[in-house]
Amino acid sequence: MFKRIALVCALFSGICFAEGKQLLDKVVAIVNDNVITSSELNAQVELSKKQIIAQNMQMPDESVLRKQVLQHLIDVDLEMQMAKQNGITIENAEIDEAIEKIAASNHLNLSQMRDEITKQGISWQEYRQNIRKEMLISRVQQKAVGKDIIVTNEQVEQYLKNAGRIENSNLTYHLKNIVIPLSEEPTTKQLQRAKIEAENLLNKIKKGEDFSRLAIEESSGEFALEGGDLGERHLAELPEVFAKEVVHMKVGQVAGPIRAGNGFHLIKLVAVGGENQRHVITQTHVRHILLKPDASMVPSEAIKQVNNIYRQIQSGKDFALMAKQYSLDAASAVKGGDLGWVNPGELVPEFEKTMNSLPLHKVSKPVKTQYGWHLIEVIARRQKDDSEAFKKQQVRQFLQQRKFVEAVQNWQQHLRSQAYINIVDKDLA
């Protein structure tokens, strides 16, 4: 995204000229050996304005918005630099797949998706580049901190035990957030200054100033340009210091300043969601016969044999006997191919898709998966209340997300502390 321009040119004038003294672009900031130009800043400011209008938020002062957007671009550039250093790339096919999923989740086809993007004043190429950037940043964050995120069974059980003592622990909480940042190792003066700044913002909010506008203008949080909107979160997803507050807050109330690792926070409770409903799943009792190429059977022979077995079963041969005689899945073959009761998501997608489409007691045509060729028969289906297991899995995911967010914030803080950042345009400093 960012253009590389000779540092000497940027340092002395902030403006670079081509051979004919033609103006190229103005440098507004230097981030290590990268630069951010005024055209890049202007484009992102315009995009942010459109988002603010679309979300019906108060528009902040132009100069304040430009400063905030520049800080966002600096953070993005630092992470993009880390992605490059680590050799992380995103293939076009991966972008295509991501866009298809986004379109499907919005009940649009690709043509409709293009139209919607164009209506927002964004070219399709720009949109693809933004998706690429988001995927790169997500991947570099995972590489930087993901391997260290571990949630044990004991932590899940302890959370559930503690949550049982907290009223409304099963609810979801829609929050907005303002972050006044701190360095990795703040001095006493820096702590006092940040806390006073947070208290001053809290007083402004109490006097009627708009929380979202102040978040855009003052917050250093990841969602500052979205008005500090964190969206709807389960209690387990929130930092513990937030969770302790929100269960006692009323909708519309603002709490803080709250001290966390990356700074002082103000949080606003926008809405409270309903309790999680019962989670019921469809279990399937299924059996299969597996044929796969090996040293004694080339692929063409495997296909020929599985089709032959299919024809024999269609002619009345017993599925279980054929499984015992021919299936190469040793564990299930001795049981007549019986896999027992399986839950959604336990089997490979190609197998599960065919299984779910089968009527009871009808044998599928040969199905190819990574393991070989399968013949599948559904023996029975039943509904099961999976609420307890589902709740534990949700809590595990929420705790992982909480740890991940906190680790990413600390990593971003460290990136900034180690970087050379020079805001050349002093109006933006």
UniProtKB/Swiss-Prot annotation:
It catalyses: [protein]-peptidylproline (omega=180) = [protein]-peptidylproline (omega=0). Residues 170-271, 281-380 form the PpiC domain. GO terms for molecular function: peptide binding; peptidyl-prolyl cis-trans isomerase activity; unfolded protein binding. GO terms for biological process: Gram-negative-bacterium-type cell outer membrane assembly; protein folding; protein stabilization. Residues 1-18 form the signal peptide. Its EC number is 5.2.1.8. It comes from the Bacteria. It is found in: Periplasm. Keywords: Chaperone, Isomerase, Periplasm, Repeat, Rotamase, Signal. Its main location: periplasm. Pfam families: Rotamase, Rotamase_3, SurA_N. One of its GO terms (cellular component) is outer membrane-bounded periplasmic space. Chaperone involved in the correct folding and assembly of outer membrane proteins. Recognizes specific patterns of aromatic residues and the orientation of their side chains, which are found more frequently in integral outer membrane proteins. May act in both early periplasmic and late outer membrane-associated steps of protein maturation. The PPIase activity resides only in the second parvulin domain. The N-terminal region and the C-terminal tail are necessary and sufficient for the chaperone activity of SurA. The PPIase activity is dispensable for SurA to function as a chaperone. The N-terminal region and the C-terminal tail are also required for porin recognition. This is Chaperone SurA. The gene is surA.
